[in-house]
Amino acid sequence: MEVNRKDNSFLITGGGGYFGFRLACALLKTSSKVVLFDVSPPIQDLPEGLIFMRADIRDYAQVEKAVRGSHCVFHIASYGMSGREQLNRKLIEEVNVKGTENILRACVAHSVPRLIYTSTFNVVFGGQEIKNGDESLPYLPLHLHPDHYSRTKSIAEMQVLKANNLALSNSTGVLRTCALRPAGIYGPGEQRHLPRIVSYIENGIFRFVYGDPDSLVEFVHVDNLVSAHLLAADALTEKQQCRAAGQAYFISDGRPVNNFEFFRPLVEGLGYSFPTLRLPISMIYFFAFLTEMVHFVVGRIYNFQPLLTRTEVYKTGVTHYFSMRKAREELGYEPKLYDLEDVVQWFQARGHGKKRSRSSIRKLILDVFVVVAFVAVLLSCLPVVGQ
């Protein structure tokens, strides 16, 4: 795939993260300048020609400095996607909403003609079943979002699409914007979800699955997501009749799959047995609710990592998948086939995998812990005697 990127300067907010860095490396092959904007640098060494700018998206002065001179901005930066991050409402609001406002304001002020926003499936999903949905679906009402991350991402996406066709300062042109709504990202070296899953596997916590075995969700390999962003940037140019301007697109591998079956190759590839115990999703949701309540009470003293949040239960246990038709027809997006083989190899190369011997005492303690935890949840559901 060839995308016209010569003589262009690109800025990637959130460029220090896994996806942002992969996108930058792809852009660097043919563009004149690629700048990574983030509060932390990538864990990888920067290839020659890639520029890192340490800055905070909440600070307009820093955003303005970074945007100046750019021809296209990929706005990836966000906060609160998973785990305990989902429970920090203040920071989520500041990064996802105010940060997006800063980016839009700076793009207009410095006559940046293109902005691609990395959104999420969650702008239309809040726990309800969706089969082969498309972009005609309305936004989920803000008050129905089960978490603040999804709510603020929805607000930010609406801001971005509303900004399409805004007149640029000191220019006769306008700002062209679009939004991509990716599924859960995977690939070798992914640092948010996969390490957490592997830690659960290795620590003996992954002892059960939940929900309907026929429930289907979607994922997107990082390289497919990179491809979609490059195509979207090109589809905002005059050469491509700006056909993506003001549009949103669902992006995935296009292969709905049961969440737990998707990770089976990872579990078994690392030498562990796939769990056979299946629990009702209502029980897991209630457990997640209790965990969030405990975190709300003690989080400032001990900011522990919740096993699951309510949103994560929905995302992993309730059917929701979307059509790629619009992305295929308007962007030319054609996802390639990937599996978890390279992910398994990545973890194995770093010493992960079941060891030959394991303490039977440790295993017993873990088994007892799991049983006690779920007995406690069940007992908490029972009515109090005498009331």
Curated annotation (Swiss-Prot):
The active site is at 149 (proton acceptor). It is found in: Membrane. Keywords: Membrane, NAD, Oxidoreductase, Transmembrane, Transmembrane helix. It is a multi-pass membrane protein. NAD(+) binds at residue 153. GO terms for cellular component: membrane. GO terms for molecular function: oxidoreductase activity, acting on the CH-OH group of donors, NAD or NADP as acceptor. GO terms for biological process: steroid biosynthetic process. CDD domains: 3b-HSD_like_1_SDR_e. It is an enzyme of class 1 (oxidoreductase). The keyword Repressor does not apply. InterPro entries: 3Beta_OHSteriod_DH/Estase, Lipid_A_modif_metabolic_enz, NAD(P)-bd_dom_sf. Its EC number is 1.1.1.-. The keyword Membrane applies. Belongs to the 3-beta-HSD family. This is Short-chain dehydrogenase/reductase family 42E member 1. The lineage of its organism: Eukaryota, Metazoa, Chordata, Craniata, Vertebrata. The gene is sdr42e1.
